[in-house]
Every structure is written in structure tokens, then in C-alpha cells.
Amino acid sequence: VVGRPAAIAPPASGADLAPYFTLTQVASGLTQPVAAANAGDGSGRLFIIERAGVVRILQAGSLLSTPFLDIRSRVEDGGSEQGLLGLAFHPDYASNGRFFVHYTRADRALVIAEYAVGADPDQADANSESVMLVIPKNHTNHNGGTLAFGPDGLLYISTGDGGGGGDPGDNGQNLDSLLGKILRIDVDGASPYAVPAANPFASDGDPDTRGEIWAYGLRNPWKYAFDRASGDLWIADVGQSRQEEVNFQAAASPGGENYGWRLMEGSLCYNPSSNCNPGGLTMPVAEYSQSATGGCSVTGGYVYRGTQSPALHGIYLYGDFCSGDIWGLEPDGSGGWSSYALTDAGFLISSFAEDEAGEVYAFDYGAGGLYQVSLRSFADVLPSYWAFEEIEAIYQAGYVAGCSADPRLYCPDRILNRAESAVFVLRGEYGSIADPPHTPPATPTFVDVATSFWGYGWIESLWIDGFTAGCSADPLAYCPDSQHTRAEGSVFFLRILNAPSYEPPAPVGLFDDVDLGAWYAGWVEAAYNAGLLPACASGPLRFCPEDELDRAWAAYMLVQAKGGLPLP
């Protein structure tokens, strides 16, 4: 616990973050969630797509009971890859109420349609549909699905190659087909949309190319995302039977990249005997083998730009639907890219999501859960641990640095000794101080605490401030290595709550196991009444004053003594 803890520093290797990477469930009760979007209107709402054709709102941690949009009557979700797949809000949604969806129709076609919000801001007008684009296809799979507005204010659309396995129509390489592409259109131009003049094939003079195409050579890029800070585009493309890949397009790109499918699958020749030539193709910045990882379908995510986990800043997060693995990806400093494992989510990752604040989430497709991505402070204190919030709070406030540095551990079940408790108490009193608040005397006050002892200054400061009278009077001793009891903790933390000179009221006999004549009787009753420590048993009520106090309970008591969560 000695020293002021530093925030988690940007890792020398992103893998250094793996012990702290955390998924915390923030919503449940969804049915096959496949995507989400925020409206960018300052409401803080997250709009979640359920594959059958429903959009639900998560607001302030609660799912609203009434859907924002229900178009199940229009959506075909019979195939496992069909359904309502994409949602994007117009950049001026706060003033114009326009949003766009991507879904599959009964005839297997892909539909891009515009809707408007209704009079109730939490409900869309389901009858306001205006179909903008219909893309026919022959198979139920490989539909792409993501919609997003780029930093240029234009709408980007991902489409799969049309399915059937192996791209039988060679749509990925066919510039006369809108399948197997990223498209870019202007929804504020002509009706139903305009083709931006700057699109790479809009003005090439070739009647056999489609002007809507922004990038091609894709198999099933059903998840892509823009980096909200840089404008860079990240495209995760699901592989056939060998490789899963992540592609990168810099914000300054004029478009027109050919990402290789079906000439290539990742960096491999799709047909090994073809001796394919990768010249002119844009190779992935990350890829992984299905057979080597147990993966089957890459799920693209987001570059983290939130504020709650600064060490994740600038890292692209992505995962695999089947294996549940989540990776980070970032430049390696030498012109290449570094990808590293962060966690196994333990569920089918159907999508990632980004809220208005830049925080990132992952969806559990099977169980219908939504999990927020974050970094916990200690590798050995999971979000499910009973004192997780208290331990996180005192670390972030600078009261503790943990019991081990690499990886950072808190050791919540380790019993607190009286030397460590001196640091806890004085930081509770003074805040996140790095050194004892008083200069210790040259001659020790306590016979059992030498000037060379690591906690000498802390224990002397505890004495100077009147927090302790030691563990014995003749000779005066502190017992620094003695394990802390619940009774002793009651004294220390009550004095943080009140003042070092605090004395408790006379005891009234609350506890069956506390004799009224015991030195600590008034202290434990006062600690219980102040909410610093609960009873250890009821019927009859017991306090267990001689039980040892571990570091988790010390964190709990410190938080309560400082007024509870959140800490001031």
C-alpha cells in the first residue's frame, strides 16, 4: 500500500492490459441483438437492434419497454444471417429526426430505407418508411449490414458478396455489382439519394461500374466503424473457411481500395493453385486462422475513444463470434500493426457498440446481454467481487496502490496488519498523500517500531494525530505485524468519520457476543450504527469483534467513513 498509485499507463505492449480487461453487464433481456447506434443528439440513449426487426432503447441503464421501431412485418429473418442488420442516425438527427436502416426482405434482397422519429422522441413513425435502395441477391447469407455516416456526412453501407459460398457470381470483384462492397451515398442530395461526385468510380466514364462503390473485394463486411477521432475506417471481413481479416482505410483515402476477395482470403490465395497476384490489392492489417483459434466469424468493433479507461485510448477492439475472443489492434511503431489477445468473453459476440461518450460495448447474441468494456484496476478483483466498487474507488482516489505491481493485485482476502492500517487511516484522513503527514521523531515512540521499519513514519504520524494509543502501555508498543480485528477497525475508521479525538457513546448491549465491560463495546456499537461495518450474524445479533479484518473490508470501511460512493 506504500506510495501513490499511478493511473494505468499506456502499455509497452497492449497485451499488458489483458489482466485488467473487463466486461461488465449493463443490460439483459434482449433477443438476438446484432447492432446498436447512438443518435448523437445528447440524449445518451443507445438504440439496440434485435435481428427480428425491432429497435429498443437503452437509457440510463434501463431498457425501455416500448420499442423505438418495430418493422418485423417487413423484415425477413428466416436465414441465420438475415434480419434487421443496420441503423444509422443522420448527423442532424437532433433537428431533422431522420434515420436509416438496413434489412433483408422476403425475396432475399437488401433494403436501405429511411424513417422519421414520431412525436414521442422514444418512438419512431413506423409508417414513414421511404425505401432508398434495393439490392437483389440470390442467397440468404452474406448480407453485410452496417450503416454509418462518415466524418464527411455521407452514408456508408456494407454489403456482402451475395452468399452461396465462394462468391459464385464473383460479385466482390465485379464493379457492376453493389454486392461485396462498401458503398457511399449522399442522402441529402437528389431523391432517393445522390452519388457523390468524388466517389472513385462515379466519374470514370465506364458505364459498367457503379458510382455508389467506395471500396470492393469484400466477402461479408458486416461490421465496420469509423474512428471518431481520426476518421479512419476499420472494416472487419468474415472469411470463407481459413482466414478472418481486419482491413484499414486511412481517413485521407480517396476510396477505391480492392481488399482482395475472392482472389485472396486474408493474405492467402483463396484458390491455392491459382498463384494469385496480390499486386494492387490492399492487404489486411490483421488476420487470424479459423483452425488455429477456433474462430469462425470476425466481429469488427471500434477504436476506443472513451474516457473511463484511458489506457485503451486509440486501440481498435474486435472479436470473434464463435470463439468469444477479443483482441486489441494498434500501430506497432515500426510501420506495421500489433494485434494481441485481451480476453475470452465467454459468449457469442454478435456486435460491438459505441455510445455518445465513446465507451464501447459488446453484445452476447445467445443470452441477449450487453457488456461494457473497461479496465479494472486490479487483476485479482473482478467486477463480480462483492467489494469491487469500493476497492476501485479507493484506488482511483489514490488511497492504495495494491499489494503487488506486475500484475497489479489488491489481495482482497489478505488480512490487514496494523502497519498497513496506519497507511489506510492516514490516507483516509489526508487524502492521496505519498508520504506520512508528519516528520517522525529521531527516537521511536513505540518499542517495537524501529526507525528503519518501512511504516515508521506512518505509525508515528498516527500517534501524533491521536488516532492510536498503541497495543500496550508498559512498555508502549504498537504491534505493527499483528493482524487487524474488526474491533480495532471500528476505532480507526470511526475516527476518520468523526475526528481523531472521537470517543463513542456508552454501549447499550446491541450484540450478543460483546460484553458491556469490553474495551471495544462502545466502539463496535458506534461502528455498526454508523454503517461502517455490518453485523456478522443475526438472531441473535453478533459483531464478531475479534475476527480479523481483511483488505476488502478495510476498503469498505474506508469508503463508508468518507461518506460512501462515489468518493468526494
Task: Label the model's feature ranges.
Residues V1-G166, K223-F226, S230-Q243, G294-G336, ...:
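Acidic, Gly/Ser/Thr-rich repeat motifs that build Ca2+-stabilized beta-propeller blades
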Residues V2-T22, L63, P121-D125, P192-D204, ...:
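Blade/loop signatures of beta-propeller domains
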Residues P19, G29-L30, S80-E81, H139-N141, ...:
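Conserved loop/turn at the beginning of each blade in beta-propeller domains
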Residues A52, A109, G169-L179, Q243, ...:
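A detector of repeated loop/turn-to-beta-strand junctions in beta-rich toroidal repeat architectures
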Residues I112-D120, N171-V187, Q249-A250:
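Beta-propeller blade signature
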Residues L218, G336-E356:
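Conserved blade-ending motifs and adjacent loop-strand segments that build the rim/top face
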Residues R376-F388, A401-A419, L426-W458, A469-A487, ...:
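Feature responds to low-complexity, polar/acidic, surface-exposed segments characteristic
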